Design a protein with these regions (language model features):
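Bacterial N-terminal signal peptides
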Residues: 8-17
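Bacterial N-terminal signal peptides that target proteins for export
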Residues: 1-7
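Hydrophobic beta-strand positions in extracellular immunoglobulin-like domains
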Residues: 115, 140, 154-156
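Predominantly the C-terminal beta-signal and adjacent terminal strand-loop region
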Residues: 136, 145-197
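Outer-membrane beta-barrel translocator domains and adjoining extracellular loop/strand segments
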Residues: 45-53, 57, 88-94, 121-129, ...
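Gram-negative (and chloroplast) outer-membrane scaffold detector with strong preference
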Residues: 65-134, 142-146, 175, 179-186, ...
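Ser/Thr- (and often Asn-) enriched beta-sheet segments in non-cytosolic proteins
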Residues: 58, 130-132, 156
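Short glycine/proline- and aromatic-enriched beta-strand/turn motifs that initiate or cap beta-hairpins
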Residues: 20-70, 76-83, 115, 177-197
Length: 197
């Protein structure tokens, strides 16, 4: 009997939080996720004197992206994009990396640093080759309503070791891509003006 009383007294003395009858606070922010599609226009980064072999230098295509924002002003972006030229030439990228954003009412400017894999398809489907690739980008998301967003963005890509691995290619490869798209928002509080939404 005394042992049980002593253990109870020690437990309540050492852990006073056990005496509280209030509930623990709940999380105040939900995870925000967007999934969207893009239409892209690109300068493929091919030297202008290579148009005889590689065709036109204004590529067009599209892609998909997803953003996951676990905290205010910081998130993660994943994207896949493919742009097409002529002569069977196309460029495809698979990227992931951090993004940083600010909120101003319905406007959300952002910047991102992505890394991933890039694939170049050579003229007339002769061959394709993959490279490690890095991207610096930025843009603006505009909230139409609680679930739909419009996006405009620019990306500068650097395909590492392209110029050294591709024989007789006129220089390195650094595509520039402008994209416009729309996304659907899941979770979070899209109508809140605090934090992101």
């Amino acid at each position: 009997m005394y042992l049980k009383t002593i253990i109870t007294a020690l437990a309540l003395g050492l852990f006073p939080s056990l005496l509280m009858s209030q509930a623990m606070p709940t999380a105040s922010r939900q995870l925000n996720v967007q999934v969207g599609g893009l239409f892209s226009m690109a300068n493929p980064g091919i030297a202008s004197d290579a148009t005889i072999v590689y065709g036109q230098m204004n590529f067009k295509g599209g892609g998909l992206y997803a953003t996951i924002d676990p905290a205010d002003h910081f998130g993660l972006e994943m994207s896949v994009r493919q742009v097409f030229g002529t002569e069977g030439v196309h460029e495809r990228t698979y990227d992931v990396g951090p993004r940083f954003y600010l909120s101003h009412g319905r406007f959300m400017p952002y910047g991102k640093v992505l890394f991933g894999r890039a694939v170049f398809n050579f003229p007339n489907n002769f061959a394709n080759q993959a490279f490690t690739e890095g991207t610096l980008g930025g843009g603006l998301d505009y909230r139409l309503n609680s679930v739909l967003y419009l996006r405009g963005e620019y990306e500068y890509q650097r395909w590492f070791s392209f110029g050294t691995q591709v024989t007789a290619f006129p220089g390195s490869l650094s595509p520039s891509v402008a994209s416009f798209g729309v996304s659907y928002h899941f979770g979070g509080n899209a109508d809140c003006e605090c934090g992101r939404y």
